[in-house]
Amino acid sequence: MAKITQTMISQLLAAVGGSSNVSKCGNCMTRLRLTLANNGVADQAVIKQIPGVMGVVESDEQFQIILGPGKAQQAAELMNKLIESVINGDVQEQAIASDTNDLSSVAAEQKKQMKSKQTSAVQRFLSKFATIFTPLIPGFIAAGLLLGFATLLEQMFVLEQTPSQFMLDLIAYMKVFGKGLFAFLSILIGYNAQQAFGGSGVNGAILASLFVLGYNPDATSGIYSGMSEFFGYTIDPRGNIIGVLLAAIIGAQVERKVREYMPDDLDMILTSVVTLLIMGVITFVVIMPIGGELFKGMSWLFLNLNDNPLGAAILAGLFLISVVFGIHQGFVPVYFALMEAQGFNSLFPILAMAGGGQVGASLALYFKAKKDAVLRTQVKGAIIPGILGIGEPLIYGVTLPRVKPFVTACIGGAAGGFFIGLVSYLGLPVGLNTVFGPSGIVAIPLMTSHSGIFAGMAVFVVGLLISYVVGFLATYFFGSKDVDLS
């Protein structure tokens, strides 16, 4: 696979319209995420031809270039440095060939932009969740792995035994990071959410803290807020992450509106004061009760879907489509709801089966292709990341361009999801021990259940194997006919 080089980044920057067209450059684990002033200037055909680019996902809010695991962060760092150098005049930007004076071209471009705005409102909204949660993913994974290893040590050396003090201290030490993360996670999310929707992150963090504080003066744990009611109105800090997101999203809009009317000289002093006073009322009186009901409803819906084999199959089968459109981060609030309701994330292993279907489908294409086929080289380069839970190289490099294998990969994922849902229906729900984590075989140590981690790990492994096998067979016999295997 192509390395990330200065030349490649220069080509990408030129193809997206130059530094003047890039408002913001960031990344997630596998994608370079750009906020462009005008998406229509970007030449997708040229971008896709640049070595190392696996695909492009476009929305009105973000222009996502898929580069694969371990490359997106490096690309973002290089591009930000290049943009800074161009702005400072240290380097000359690569010329962009674009005929913007042609009236028909301008009209066509405007039509494209308007159509995007009309058809992708949900996609634009959900894409912001990537901005909110992607920076937190490494912490989720680290805390989850440490908790998984701590639980494993606990079951092997503590339960029904007389453990050493060192072992008890080690287990407590490995667990403390997860406790710290989840104790203040709402504040981190509030900060990111308000910032993502155009407000000040610190205001979002303060609003989120209203859900963390305690309102019972007799409570023996937590931080007492100093108030038990709001002007005679009982405070019930329900809603968890749903309430925090609602408060931050609405708070960003309120802050922007306040700033419109606030004199520049007073902006630094009063904008946040007015925003917090307004949002405090809205949060205590409206958002907390509504957020609580939404949180309960979301938990009930997905608990019932997860415990239903058909529901689980549908969720797993459709998940790859959400990845293609870049809206899969929209499931993260659901993960929080399930963590609150069950103590683990029972949706994640179901959705992870989609990656297993990709692996099986890609292996089938490998065996169907001739020994000297380019397809075999593509599969070789992407199959290991796929097994480890990073499926985008397989999606954009192998199955999606050939369409039929993508469909049969979804079928493989649905089969694995059906199995996970069936086991849950029979009384053994399994899930991730943290909100978010890696999928594929890397997720095995993070699996748990009410019957312990070994049962959770076993169910997950069997589900993955089913996804591999069904994805392979469906593709080998049905998904490779009339498909380019060169």
UniProtKB/Swiss-Prot annotation:
The chain crosses the membrane at residues 129-149, 170-190, 196-216, 230-250, 268-288, 312-332, 347-367, 381-401, 411-431, 453-473. GO terms for biological process: phosphoenolpyruvate-dependent sugar phosphotransferase system. InterPro entries: Glu_permease_IIB, PTrfase_EIIB_Cys, PTS_EIIC, PTS_EIIC_1, PTS_IIB_1, PTS_Sugar-Specific_Components. It catalyses: N-acetyl-beta-D-muramate(out) + N(pros)-phospho-L-histidyl-[protein] = N-acetyl-beta-D-muramate 6-phosphate(in) + L-histidyl-[protein]. It comes from the Bacteria. Residues 127-486 form the PTS EIIC type-1 domain. Residues 1-89 form the PTS EIIB type-1 domain. Pfam families: PTS_EIIB, PTS_EIIC. CDD domains: PTS_IIB_glc. It is a multi-pass membrane protein. Its main location: membrane. Its EC number is 2.7.1.192. One of its GO terms (molecular function) is protein-phosphocysteine-N-acetylmuramate phosphotransferase system transporter activity. It is found in: Cell inner membrane. Keywords: Cell inner membrane, Cell membrane, Kinase, Membrane, Phosphotransferase system, Sugar transport, Transferase, Transmembrane, Transmembrane helix, Transport. The EIIB domain is phosphorylated by phospho-EIIA on a cysteinyl or histidyl residue, depending on the transported sugar. Then, it transfers the phosphoryl group to the sugar substrate concomitantly with the sugar uptake processed by the EIIC domain. The EIIC domain forms the PTS system translocation channel and contains the specific substrate-binding site. The phosphoenolpyruvate-dependent sugar phosphotransferase system (sugar PTS), a major carbohydrate active transport system, catalyzes the phosphorylation of incoming sugar substrates concomitantly with their translocation across the cell membrane. This system is involved in N-acetylmuramic acid (MurNAc) transport, yielding cytoplasmic MurNAc-6-P. Is also able to take up anhydro-N-acetylmuramic acid (anhMurNAc), but cannot phosphorylate the carbon 6, probably because of the 1,6-anhydro ring. This is PTS system N-acetylmuramic acid-specific EIIBC component. The gene is murP.
